[in-house]
Amino acid sequence: MKQYQTEAIVLRASAVREADRTLVLLTRDRGKLRVWAHGAARPTSRKRGAVQPFCRSRFLLERGREIDVVRQAEALEEFPALHADLEALALAGYVCELAEGFAAEGQAEPGIYGLLLQVLRRLAEDKSGLPVRFFEARILALTGFGPELGSCAGCGAQPVVPARFSPALGGVLCRGCRDRDPPARPCRSAVVQVLGKLLEWPLDRLKVLRIDAATGREVADILQACVCHHLEREPRSLAFLRKMGISSS
């Protein structure tokens, strides 16, 4: 099959020459794709709106020897609010970078696709940081890296009174195991409770959650440490958020 159709969210668009773009797409049925959009940046191009970052679009793609080519593109959902506000733009860029980092190439990713679409819709109206925490926790869980909260990640003891959290070991450590991973960070019971709700509650229900500033920072630090550990790097967009002083906690 030389041509095929797919629905995708544009994770990233990079300029090539004056009017061409290379795109990183996230699809339900084919996972992550890298494609070439010839002439997409021309003012008269019908593809132009459909290839913008964060846009949900329907694509007609043609297989190429090295990279597939966009033949047609139709925007289904454009999220103008995410482009109109620097903070929303930066947060959306961060979750899209995480989706790109965790999604498999050429393998169906319906869970990550649905999660990303849900969070982009929420970020268009809510920049509290909670949708981002929800995304971090859920994408870790979807890809098999969800934090272990109910038992000690060191010895398996249940129930566990958390003393520290270890991204490397994948969860909370009891007092007896707290020195097994020196980089592990202190972790209070209140933080574990919030992490549990992020993993269990639907996004709409989290609106009722009241989190004090200190707990919010600790939750953000733990989830971002997990993300960096499993990606084996710090996302560039996370560094940008910090540089710009944009709070994602």
Swiss-Prot record:
Task: Specify the domain of life of the species encoding this protein.
Answer: Bacteria
Which InterPro entries does this chain map to?
A: ARFGAP/RecO, DNA_rep/recomb_RecO_N, NA-bd_OB-fold, RecO, RecO_C
- SUPFAM superfamilies with a match to the protein in the record: ArfGap/RecO-like zinc finger, Nucleic acid-binding proteins
Which Gene Ontology cellular component terms are annotated? Answer: bacterial nucleoid
Which keywords are on file for this protein?
DNA damage, DNA recombination, DNA repair
UniProt KW DNA damage keyword:
yes
Biological process (GO) annotations held by this record are: DNA recombination; double-strand break repair
- Similarity comment: family membership: Belongs to the RecO family.
**Protein's job:** Involved in DNA repair and RecF pathway recombination.
Q: What NCBIfam families does UniProt report for this protein, alphabetically?
A: reco
| Protein known as | DNA repair protein RecO
Q: From the UniProt record, report the name of the gene that encodes this protein.
A: recO
